């Protein structure tokens, strides 16, 4: 049966937008400028559990996705990091003018302990090891806490119109700065470059470092029948 060009294009578009679910430890799918990961990197810390991530749609630079999980055991240990990672060419911070992003998300489930965060990495060279990890927690649910050397914030800045507690601690050879929102922020729209500008001005972060990774997702510690829904996410580096 022959199809008209318009019908064929419509079918192709529908196929491209078909929902894709993956449940394996390192499962991923590439859509537009993003790689969506399941990333069950800490599942060995759990006594039981599972997780599946689903790509739902992409419109322009906006991706819609969700992840469903249940994890028990391994108290205080992160089990996974389902996330949307932006594909871009690493740039020196001094050359990064903006990192515009929007993010709308929701969580449901029982006894959820998890964070919802941007996770960004800096290196001394475009392809080198990560030297700094910059996290921006929009949600710290059920008592989830960041990496910290002291357990106390080193500052309480307001960035992008949101009040944060800022923590600092090591993750292997990396230094980790974690901006933890004082109140859960389910809808965000702003320039992530502002967080680096703050660190450059107040914590001595070098603008000669390269921005090499920009990711956003959720780190579950424990809970059951959890559904993390991202109804709107976009980010771009300019």
Curated annotation (Swiss-Prot):
Location in or out of the cell: Secreted
Positions annotated with a glycan in the UniProt record: 106, 171
GO terms, molecular function: cellulase activity; hydrolase activity, acting on glycosyl bonds; xyloglucan-specific endo-beta-1,4-glucanase activity
InterPro entries, alphabetized: ConA-like_dom_sf, GH11/12, GH12
Keyword Glycosyltransferase: no
Highest taxon listed in the record's lineage: Eukaryota
Main location: secreted
Family according to the record: Belongs to the glycosyl hydrolase 12 (cellulase H) family.
Classification via PANTHER family: BLR1656 PROTEIN, XYLOGLUCAN-SPECIFIC ENDO-BETA-1,4-GLUCANASE A
Function in brief: Catalyzes endohydrolysis of 1,4-beta-D-glucosidic linkages in xyloglucan with retention of the beta-configuration of the glycosyl residues. Specific for xyloglucan and does not hydrolyze other cell wall components.
Name by which UniProt lists this protein: Probable xyloglucan-specific endo-beta-1,4-glucanase A
UniProt organism field: Aspergillus fumigatus (strain ATCC MYA-4609 / CBS 101355 / FGSC A1100 / Af293) (Neosartorya fumigata)
Origin organism lineage: Eukaryota, Fungi, Dikarya, Ascomycota, Pezizomycotina
